[in-house]
Amino acid sequence: MDGEGRWARYRMPDAAIDAAAREEVDGPVIPLSEAGASIRTYVRQTPEARKPVGYDRKFLDRYRPNASFYLTEQDRTHLAAVGRPQVVEQPAGTYAKQILSRLLIDLAWNSSRLEGNTYSLLDTKRLIELGEEAVGRAHLETQMILNHKDAIEFLVGAADEIGFNRYTVLNLHALLANNLLPDPTAVGRLRHIAVGIERSAFHPLEVPQLIAESFDQILATAAAIRDPFEQAFFVMVQLPYLQPFDDVNKRVSRLAANIPLIKHNLTPLSFADVPRQTYTEAVLGVYELNEIALLKDVFMWAYERSAARYAAIRQSLGEPDPFRLRYREQFRQLIAELVRARVGRKDATARIGAWSEQEIDSRDREHFAEIVEAELIGLHEGNFARYRISPSEFAAWRQVWEAR
C-alpha cells in the first residue's frame, strides 16, 4: 500500500508482476471462454487506454437471489457432481475437518501466492506445521500465511455458526489483516478512507455510509442464495468490487467463498495452480467492466482442480470414525474444559472419568475416555483451534501439562 490516511493506493510490486508473467508462461493455462478472452484482451491494455470507471451500485442491485444467476444451471450441476463427496449426511464442516491439515497448507499458500507472497509450498508447510519461519523471507509474508491459517481454522472450527453476516466476515477480515495494516484500528472494520488501485482504471466507492449499506446488501443477498456454488462465486465477484476494507479484500473474498462449501460439506476451493496474472486480470474485468466471464472461467477451472485433489486425499484417509462422529460435541466440550481449567497429566484421568459418568452412555465411557486422553496427549499449537481454545488458553494449559 502506498500512502496513509484519507487516500491510499494499492499496488502490485514490480517484482511480483514479473513473477506473475513468468508463471503465466511456465504454469498451467486456464481454458478461456470467448467472453473471458475478450475481457483479458481489454484489461491487458495500459491503464491509460482503458476507460476510468467508478463503483456502480446497479451491478449489485440488478442481482436477484435465486432468480438471476452468475453460474448457469449446467455449471451448478457440474460443480455439485464433482464437489460433493459420496458420504452420508454429516454435521457442517465434517469434510473440511477430515482434510484440514492439507487444506491449511494448500489454501494458505495459494491465497498468499495470489497476493505475491514468495514463500514456497515447502516453506509454508514448515511454517504451519512446525512454526519455522523461512530464512530470507519478509516478516510480512510470514504474517500473511499465519493469518490465513488462523482464518481457515476459524471457518472450519465454527462451521455451525459462520455465515454471510457481519460477525463472520468482519472477523474473517480481522484474522487475515492482523498485524498487516498501517492503521491497527482498521482490522475488522469497514473502510473509512478512500483507496485507489494501482494500474487500474477503477475508482472504488468513497462514502463510508454507502460502503456500509452496500456491504450489508452483499451479505443479505449472499445469505439468501440457496445454491452453495452460486453463493461462493457471488462473494468472489461482489466483495472485492466493493473494496469494503482498507486492504485484504480479495483475501477475504477467497476465504468467504469457502463458507458455503464448508457448511455443506463440499470440496473446499484452494485455488491450487491458479495463475496469478489470470486471476488478477479476471478481478480487473469485474472492477472495470462489471463482466464476470473471465473470473467465472477461473472459478470453474480452480474448483475442478480442488475437487480432484481432495477426492484423492480423502480416499487415502478412509471413512471417518463413527464413534468420534457421534460424540463430536462431547469431545470438543470436555477437551476445551480441561484445557481452560489447566488440568495436568496427574489429574486428567480422574476428571475425564467423572465427566464421562455424567454425560456418556455407560457402554461407551471407557472408549470415550481413551480417545480424550489420546487427544490431550496429541494436542499441539497446530491443532488446538478445533476445540475453540484461544492461543493464551492453550499456552497456559501446556505449561501445566508439560510440568513434571
Predicted regions span which residues?
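FIC/Doc superfamily catalytic core
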Residues: 1-404
